[in-house]
Amino acid sequence: MAKTDPQYQTQISACYRCQSPLEPLPRAQFFIKTTPLAQKVLKKITAGELTIYGAGHDKILHHWLTNLHDWNISRQIVWGIRLPIWYHAQSNPKIAVSFLTNHKHSGDGITIKALDNGKYVVSGTLGKLLPKYSLDEIKQGLQSLIAPAKAKYILKLDEQNSQELIQETDTFDTWFSSSQWPFSTLMNNRPGDFKRYYSAAVLETGYDILPFWVMRMLLIGNFVTGKLPFKRVYLHGLVRDQKGQKMSKSKGNVINPLDVVAKYGADALRFALVVRSTPGMDKSIGEGDFKAARNLTNKIWNAARFVKLLHQESATNNSPLPKDQEFQLKINHLITQISSLLDQYKIGTAADVLYDEFWHFYCDQAIEWAKNSQLSKKLVTLGLRVMLQLLHPFVPFVTEKIWQELGTIVGNEKLLATSVWPKSLTTTI
């Protein structure tokens, strides 16, 4: 060393819990070779077996799959699923371990640290420790294990020699564990579940975890089952404040959804988040959006009260009225339009169209026609039935409550949620 500076200062990372200094420690890790897995997934994506809804994120997924490095799946943290890897203790004397015990047996190459609770943290290699401590005692208090890169291990326990083995303390990368969710939850559940539900029709998640969770599920799911775990991926964006800024506590612009529900209702929150949203794009939202959605739910209630009152006060007129045909054509077109938008996963656009048509056509025009005896009671009632069915995915609580209150006025089905999706405006209930 040519020169030292005793006044030199540097930054040292500290544990956020105990404030002990943290120092980088190069260690052997476990990896998955991803190139063969990625090539198989890419081949199926190219064949059209997967559709990504999300503003160009299909290209992002393709980029990740074609530029993958081997995947490090081992983590040196406590919380997680321990790697199913075992070492033969006597055959691996260079494995370093640290364990808790009530006993203190010092020796060459053994480090002992006393704790306030009367226990000791003992560290050393198995070769140095086993003459002083039993393997059972080491395993019972095991805190960490560091194996050399070339240490021999086994992946399946043998009951005959399990007492001579010690398990790896590393845990799986959380994305590796969660990547198995689509098939692991079905394979070990009720008989027939896997065959019926795998592959899933749609996965909905945020675009920010596309390369972490979605891609990992594709790699592992296809490797284990030979099939992609889902046929479509719908990616939503981040929810930002009304100025388009990311929400954070420091900025003070965080919207608490529970406060919104208490003030405007769960349906208002749901509709405000969905309307005019675009897959893969961030969405700005603010107080005005919640108010507008709340006003929509009020409008639905008012329309339902009108129809209920209509059935209480007026007699049925079976004669065609001037606006009947125009109304039927309009509602049939709306059913076709909304169904098509939902089939294309243009959910935000569907909500926007429904808001406009329910408010400005059904409430502002059709109800006025009915008041002026230009539209039959039967059709305005059927129109409300269809509107409730179309609006139900977006405002489920209000529409279901209204359906229950109106009863047979709008249909014989007990639940709106299980009623058949409308195909056209029929003239019978």
Please report, for each region that a protein language model flagged, where it lies by residue:
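Flexible, glycine/threonine-enriched loop-and-boundary segments that flank and lead into catalytic domains
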Residues: 71, 128-172, 180, 184, ...
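Acidic, turn-prone loop/beta-hairpin segments
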Residues: 87, 165, 241, 274, ...
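Gly/Pro-rich turn-and-neighbor structural signature
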Residues: 64, 68, 73-75, 79-175, ...
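Conserved oxyanion/phosphate-binding beta-strand-loop segments in alpha/beta enzyme cores
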Residues: 20-43, 161-189
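Structured ligand/cofactor/substrate-binding pocket environments in proteins
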Residues: 53-90, 120-125, 132-133, 169-176, ...
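Proline-centered turn/helix-capping motifs that create local helix->coil transitions or kinks
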Residues: 225-227, 304-317, 407-411
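Residue patterns forming the tRNA-binding/recognition surfaces of aminoacyl-tRNA synthetases
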Residues: 1-96, 110-118, 125, 245, ...
